[in-house]
Amino acid sequence: MARITVEDCLEVVNNRFELVMMASKRARQLANGVPPLIENTNSEDKPTVLALREIAARKIDSKMIDEIEKAERERTEREAMEWAAAEVVADEDMSKSDD
């Protein structure tokens, strides 16, 4: 696959700072298991390269990245609440068995 350049991405994103922020957030999402939006023909591509390819292909924008982050954050919070609730139930069960 052709090499991706910053210039390719700057045709989509207005400035380098925004590009760096978008690419780093998206790369983190990809590294954490969020599936890529483009075909990953080269399995050796690192998450950063995939993120830049998605940006250059106009498959992702900052709004989509923020929505994915929000969904991941909500999922994590929900899981934490479920674990906390399970611990409370387990603690109550243990205190009842001590009686």
From Swiss-Prot:
Please state which protein family the record places this protein in: Belongs to the RNA polymerase subunit omega family.
* Record's catalysed reaction(s): RNA(n) + a ribonucleoside 5'-triphosphate = RNA(n+1) + diphosphate
Q: Which organism is it from?
A: Xylella fastidiosa (strain 9a5c)
Report the protein name in the record: DNA-directed RNA polymerase subunit omega
Could you say which EC number(s) this protein's record lists?
A: 2.7.7.6
Q: Which GO terms describe its molecular function?
A: DNA binding; DNA-directed RNA polymerase activity
UniProt KW keywords? DNA-directed RNA polymerase, Nucleotidyltransferase, Transcription, Transferase
Q: Which residues form the signal peptide?
A: none
Q: What lineage, starting at the top, does this entry show?
A: Bacteria, Pseudomonadati, Pseudomonadota, Gammaproteobacteria, Lysobacterales
Q: Which GO terms describe its cellular component?
A: DNA-directed RNA polymerase complex
Q: How does it assemble?
A: The RNAP catalytic core consists of 2 alpha, 1 beta, 1 beta' and 1 omega subunit. When a sigma factor is associated with the core the holoenzyme is formed, which can initiate transcription.
Q: Which Pfam families match?
A: RNA_pol_Rpb6
Function, in words: Promotes RNA polymerase assembly. Latches the N- and C-terminal regions of the beta' subunit thereby facilitating its interaction with the beta and alpha subunits.
Q: Which GO terms describe its biological process?
A: DNA-templated transcription
Cite the HAMAP family for this sequence. RNApol_bact_RpoZ
InterPro entries reported for this sequence = DNA-dir_RNA_pol_omega (IPR003716), Pol_omega/Rpo6/RPB6 (IPR006110), RPB6/omega-like_sf (IPR036161)
